């Protein structure tokens, strides 16, 4: 059915790619950081290993614990240990704090040109229920450093095409300088 759908779509659509239009596109800069785990994260990883051994040995009911749950907990732990336990400390050299430092530095360096940066995070999106999430933590830390709150937006807060168009206009104008999304 897909080939037929594409054929019908092409009858009504005029498709132009950015290559065909020769549009100017700024060069993206990707920053990869290698960080050491906190002591709490090291303890959690050891616990994940023990859980995995129990699952492999069939000692745990799969509805209580399984490899998918362990993997998901590992992803959360790697991002921020507070995603597994909000009472754990905010590790000084965490991925979140490193991201905040980098984002603030880029924001400072781009003040004159009002440059924009995108931060992608597919875990811990804001739910609005008061639980810890990475998005609010990043925004709070950036505003504490002096970035105006209105210059930081979450794509999730713009849930219609009209709102998204307004957001992207603000991004292009340099009114929103940090956009977070998943």
Across the structure, where does each feature detected by a protein language model lie?
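Inter-lobe coupling linker of SF2 helicases/translocases
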Residues: 1-89, 93, 105
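Short, glycine/serine-rich, charged loops/turns that create anion-binding
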Residues: 75, 81, 123-125, 159
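Phosphate/oxyanion-binding active-site loops and adjacent basic polyanion-contact surfaces
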Residues: 88-100, 130-135
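A Trp-anchored, charged/polar loop motif used as the substrate-binding/catalytic surface
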Residues: 93-107, 161-165, 169-171
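Short, high-confidence coil segments that cap the C-terminus of an alpha-helix
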Residues: 112-114, 175-176
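Conserved RecA-like ASCE P-loop NTPase motor core of nucleic-acid helicases/translocases
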Residues: 115-123
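Conserved helicase motor "Helicase C" RecA-like lobe of SF1/SF2 P-loop NTPases
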Residues: 123-154
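Conserved helicase ATPase core of P-loop NTP-dependent helicases/translocases
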Residues: 139, 148-182
């Amino acid at each position: 059915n897909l080939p037929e759908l594409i054929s019908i779509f092409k009858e009504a659509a005029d498709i132009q790619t950015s290559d065909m239009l020769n549009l100017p596109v700024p060069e993206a800069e990707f920053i990869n950081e290698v960080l050491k785990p906190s002591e709490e994260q090291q303890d959690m990883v050891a616990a994940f290993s023990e859980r995995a051994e129990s699952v492999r040995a069939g000692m745990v009911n799969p509805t209580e614990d399984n490899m998918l749950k362990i993997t998901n907990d590992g992803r959360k732990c790697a991002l921020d240990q507070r995603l597994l336990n909000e009472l754990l400390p905010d590790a000084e050299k965490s991925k979140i704090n490193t991201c905040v430092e980098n984002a603030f530095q880029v924001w400072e360096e781009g003040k004159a040109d009002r440059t924009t940066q995108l931060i992608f995070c597919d875990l811990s999106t804001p739910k609005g229920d008061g639980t810890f999430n990475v998005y609010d933590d990043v925004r709070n830390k950036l505003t504490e450093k002096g970035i105006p709150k209105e210059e930081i937006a979450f794509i999730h807060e713009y849930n219609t095409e009209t709102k998204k168009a307004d957001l992207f206009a603000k991004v292009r104008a340099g009114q929103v300088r940090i956009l977070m999304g998943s």
